[in-house]
Amino acid sequence: MKHALIIAGSRGLGFGLVREYLSRGWHVTATARTPSDELAALRGDADGRLVIESLEVTLIAQTAALATRLKGQSFDLLFLNPGILLGRGAALSDVPDSDIQNIFLTNAISPIRVADALAYLVVPGGTIAFMSSDMGSVSTNDDGRAELYRASKAALNSLIRSFRARHDKDDLTVLALHPGMVRTSMGRPDAPLDVDTSVRGLANVIEARWGSGGQVFVDYRNEIIPW
């Protein structure tokens, strides 16, 4: 039975991914800063296939502690889902420095730090997936909206490519995934996709690209996005 490690799996798309992989018969280990009631309830219905671990992704010490707790386990999939949206619609000159630091630390730096700490737990031929966004595509940025969020995801994409280069001898598939425009607390209330549709598509993409190696930036329909 396959085993997924989902980082930031308590709410929104992360929770949807936990639910999706459980429905496919996987074992799932999900991390959360503070587990939601929904995640705790899901554990009770999962017949022992869901483990919840505590993690604040921006704290290096907590990441190291998680790596120690998980030592000896192996995972077919490591999915890194941390993300926040700050300064929506604000001019960069109006966004506090603390918000700028927080969004880059959460959206770009921390996913790579966690991946570096946990990559050794991924089985040969396994997959490391990062929740990116088409807004992180530099070459398709024609409207400039959501500048801070867009820049943080572009930074994540650059770091994903560096991560893959550092792990070029490892038998891994590395995916930067765009979930589509989804109705979540971070998304728009009028977004065209619900969480279930998005995560089902993401899981299908991961399955379709299993064992392909290399790296790719792709959306939930398995369509390539230019970096």
Model-derived segments and their meaning:
Residues 7, 75-83, 107, 130, ...:
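Rossmann-fold scaffold of SDR-type NAD(P)-dependent oxidoreductases
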Residues 10-20:
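N-terminal Rossmann NAD(P)H-binding glycine-rich loop of SDR-like oxidoreductase domains
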Residues 24-40:
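Conserved glycine-rich Rossmann-like NAD(P)H-binding loop of the short-chain dehydrogenase/reductase
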Residues 43-61:
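Rossmann-fold cofactor-recognition segment
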Residues 56-73:
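Conserved Rossmann-fold cofactor-binding substructure of NAD(P)-dependent oxidoreductases
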Residues 83, 134, 175, 179-180, ...:
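Proline-glycine-enriched beta-turn/loop adjacent to the NAD(P) cofactor-binding site
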Residues 84, 88-104, 109-112, 119-120, ...:
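Catalytic loop of short-chain dehydrogenase/reductase
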Residues 169, 176-177, 184, 188-227:
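C-terminal helical subdomain
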